[in-house]
Amino acid sequence: MALLRGVWGVLSALGKSGADLCAVCGSRLRSPFSFAYVPRWFSSTLSGFPKKPMTSYVRFSKEQLPIFKAQNPDAKNSELIKKIAELWRELPDSEKKIYEDAYRADWQVYKEEVNRIQEQLTPSQMVSLEKEIMQKRLKKKALIKKRELTMLGKPKRPRSAYNIFIAERFQEAKDGPSQVKLKTINENWKNLSSSQKQVYIQLAEDDKVRYYNEMKSWEEQMVEVGRNDLIRRSMKHSAKKDTEEC
């Protein structure tokens, strides 16, 4: 199971979909939500749901990001987000209010539209499809969250030694079906000596340090722009402790 999770992570990082077969198990790699069955009529109803409005800061970031990218074409997204966050902090309250008012107005329209669509469903339909509704919402919420975090420049999670090895060898492998490549690479990993594996173990440790430092900096930025909801519990506890000591 751990191997499947590892391969799924690598395929995702390489832009592969769940349609790629796992060389080890020979079955399709499924998304955690792929088991959910949603009737066609209900899918069409949910697809008509409006998107949640962007928060004031996200709206501001989305407007500014293309401008900053044009001015700094070689800069990383995380660097640009940091500059945008600084610009947002310095923005006068009167200008911030424009974005906040726009968010409140969009939220009101969003609620009204959702209520209108929900009223079209009969009570029996709502009861019988309660689980499917929840799964659909969770999937959509996870996708929105992922896109938002990407736009906000959240650092990528550290990779394991095995994932680093696969990513490296996958790009070097000859053209062919993904499942064949993965099977070959997996066998190569098993045949590595302890000293050879140690190289990738060290790279994984270095990646953990990179992730820790980038996350610390990123979470500090999120606190500054009022996105405490994105902060890990350990970070919140540490910040609270520092405040009490002061």
From Swiss-Prot:
UniProt-annotated site: Intercalates between bases and promotes DNA bending, residues: V58, L182
Phosphoserine found at: S56, S61, S160, S193, S195
Protein's GO biological process: mitochondrial transcription; positive regulation of DNA-templated transcription; regulation of transcription by RNA polymerase II; transcription initiation at mitochondrial promoter
DNA-binding region positions on the chain: 50-118, 155-219
InterPro entries per UniProt: HMG_box_dom, HMG_box_dom_sf, HMGB
SMART domains: HMG
CDD domains membership: HMG-box_TFAM_rpt1 (cd21986), HMG-box_TFAM_rpt2 (cd21987)
Modification(s) after translation: Phosphorylation by PKA within the HMG box 1 impairs DNA binding and promotes degradation by the AAA+ Lon protease.
Pfam family, one: HMG_box
Entry keyword annotation includes Electron transport: no
Subunit structure as annotated in this protein's UniProt entry: Monomer; binds DNA as a monomer. Homodimer. Component of the mitochondrial transcription initiation complex, composed at least of TFB2M, TFAM and POLRMT. In this complex TFAM recruits POLRMT to the promoter whereas TFB2M induces structural changes in POLRMT to enable promoter opening and trapping of the DNA non-template strand. Upon metabolic stress, forms a complex composed of FOXO3, SIRT3, TFAM and POLRMT. Interacts with TFB1M and TFB2M. Interacts with CLPX; this enhances DNA-binding.
Protein's UniProt name: Transcription factor A, mitochondrial
Lineage per the UniProt record: Eukaryota, Metazoa, Chordata, Craniata, Vertebrata
